[in-house]
Each structure stands twice: as C-alpha cells, then as structure tokens.
Regions:
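Terminal presequence/propeptide segments associated with secretion/organelle targeting
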Residues: 2, 9, 16-355
Length: 355
C-alpha cells in the first residue's frame, strides 16, 4: 500500500468480449472523453451520476482511507467497507496476547463496541479543478529542476490556501502525466473512524505472500469501519458525543452476483504509476532500484521474523510493519520479472527512437 495522499481515478473494464477495453481516467473528464463509450459497453449511469460537484454522485461514496487505501460507503449510517490489509494496522493496534484480533478476528456487536483509531482519517473528494495554466505560468525552461520544484511548491501552496480559505476542507495540488498537467483536489476529511469488524487473518490474509499480487485470489480480504462526525455533520475529533456520519451517497448491496458480460469498473484512489518512465528509468529500475529494494527488504523481513517467531507479543507489535514490508518486497520481485518478460526496456527505446 502506498502511503501518499492519493488522487481519485476510475478504471473501466468493458467485458462484452474476452478482450477488455481498459483505461484509467480522472472522473471529471469522463463526460468529455469516455461517457458514450462506457454507456455503449453497458454502463447504465451518466458521467454526472459518477462525478458531480453540485449534486450527490458516486464519488461521494468513495473514500480515501488514511491516504493509503480506498474504501466505500455501504450504508446511510456511516458504514464503510475496505480491505482487510487496509485495516491491518488498526486490527494490530487493538490486539494483545490475550485478545488477538489478528488471529481471531473482531466484530462489534453494538455501536458502543466499535473501536476508535487515533490518527486514521476518511477523506471524501469534494471537487477537482485543472490549475495547469496557473502553475505553468510561473515556470520557464531556463529554470533548473530544483528551481522548478520550488516554484511549483510555492504556487501550489497559494492555490490551496485560496481554495480552502474559510472552509473546513483540505486540498492538494497534484501533477499528472509526468508533470505536464496539474489539478487541485479538494477533500472533506473525517477524523473519527471506528473499526466495526474484520475476519481472522486465516481468512483476511489467506494465501499470505504466496498469493499476494497474484490472480486469481481466494482471500476474504475485507473489513468494516464506521465514520462518525459532529452532530451537525461536520468532521470532528473522536468524541462520545459524535454521531454516525450520513454520507451524500452510498453504494447499494447487490446479492445476486454478476453474469458473464456485465459491465464492470473500479472507482478509487490508486497509488502512483511509472508508466511514463523513459528507457533510462526502466533500466535503472531493473539494474538498481528494484534489486536493491528487494535485497534490503529481504534482510529487514528476516530480522523482523526472527524476533516475531521468538515472542508472541513482538509478533503482534510488528505484524503491520512486516506486512507492509513484504507487500512491496513481493511487488518489486514481480515487477522486475514483468519488465523483463515483456521486454519493456526495448519497447521504450523503440518509442523514443520513433519520437
């Protein structure tokens, strides 16, 4: 999981044929770029149903959990669904040798039993605005890379301050497409997020590192939280006086399953992509970055495992750290294999030569 404040995107998988028509788009661009194609492939919603600044839309049910995961609102009473691996840190924080929720799972039988999680946030996207012209106007080709970065940070802070002045919102200017486009993302962030339930790790982490980053998966990778807010509906720190948040939109639960050819898509907060790396960047990843990362994490995992195997309390205390480390240890191993087998470096060179 990537610990960054994430940007919301939509990925579509149009599955009327065996070959998926795939892509990833910023939701505010759907109407101009993709709406008709998505509807032709079976989408029964409009772009306005998916993303609207002025009206309730699907974006209001999609949550950035802690800035490192995506979650979804599934009830009008603040209930939020996410992955077990996204809640793993919370589950660990509440576990002890005598009360091991990692091993046994946890289920709150009432609202009073739901567990608060200090520092965990749930952020809803309010709006996205293109600020490319304003940022680009402040930089020029004669700047060094360091000067460019400093100037972008300065103008981004000004844009954010102006956008959030007099509100309880927070915002961030993010770059896209290799630093060619800039958008400001405005969020409403809630700070009282309580753990409602999670299965035992034998279900939530079934398959462990062996199955991680693989397909198909057979893991019950889910957990439930509930968002709380002040009585007036605004974000508030944890308090017994807080009430369950009533989202502008929540996703209905469909129990009938899916059929072959159904339209499917993902709406959420991904991490980052290296898709626009040059051939030199790919070569660096293959020769230096990935193998070094794998080697360091291999040693780190071995050190942690030795201590965890020797003491149950230590095993619980380091469970989340170990999972986070092994997650991208496995990722970089697979990424290197994929880059080599797909001959990505050679393809990048061909693209650059053609350009």
């Amino acid at each position: 999981m990537t610990k960054k404040f994430l940007s919301i995107v939509m990925a579509g998988f149009f599955s009327f044929t065996a070959i998926a028509d795939e892509g990833m788009w910023l939701p505010q661009l759907l109407q101009a770029m993709n709406e008709s194609d998505m509807q032709a492939h079976g989408l029964q919603l409009t772009a306005e149903d998916l993303y609207s600044v002025n009206n309730s839309s699907m974006k209001d049910a999609i949550v950035s959990l802690g800035g490192f995961c995506t979650a979804e609102m599934i009830s009008s009473e603040g209930l939020m669904l996410t992955n077990h691996h996204c809640a793993f840190g919370s589950i660990q924080e509440h576990s002890s040798v005598s009360n091991d929720y990692l091993k046994d799972g946890f289920w709150a039988m009432s609202r009073d039993e739901e567990l608060p999680n200090e520092g965990l946030t749930a952020s809803f996207l309010v709006s996205i605005e293109d600020v490319t012209a304003r940022v680009v106007a402040e930089i020029n080709p004669d700047m060094t890379e360091q000067e460019r970065r400093v100037k972008i940070r300065e103008i981004s802070k000004t844009i954010v301050d102006e956008a959030t002045e007099g509100t309880h919102y927070n915002a961030r200017v993010k770059s896209f497409f290799g630093g060619n486009d800039f958008y400001i993302m405005k969020y409403e962030t809630f700070k009282d997020v309580r753990l409602v339930g999670a299965p035992p790790s034998s279900i939530g982490k079934f398959g462990g590192d062996t199955d991680n980053w693989m397909w198909p998966r057979h893991t019950g990778d889910f957990a439930l939280y509930r968002i709380y807010c002040a009585p007036d509906g605004t974000p508030a720190e944890y308090s017994v006086e807080n009430v369950a948040y009533q989202p502008k939109h929540h996703l209905p639960i469909q129990l009938n399953g899916v059929e072959n050819g159904d339209y499917t898509m993902i709406f959420g907060f991904p991490g980052s992509t290296d898709r626009y790396l040059t051939s030199f960047g790919v070569q660096q990843a293959l020769d230096i970055t990935s193998p070094t990362t794998v080697d360091i994490r291999t040693e780190k995992l071995a050190i942690m495992k030795a201590g965890m195997d020797a003491n149950k309390r230590t095993k619980i205390q380091y469970a989340a750290k170990y999972a986070q480390t092994s997650n991208y240890w496995k990722y970089f191993i697979g990424q290197s294999k994929g880059l080599k087998s797909m001959k990505v470096h050679d393809k990048k060179i061909a693209i650059e030569d053609d350009f």
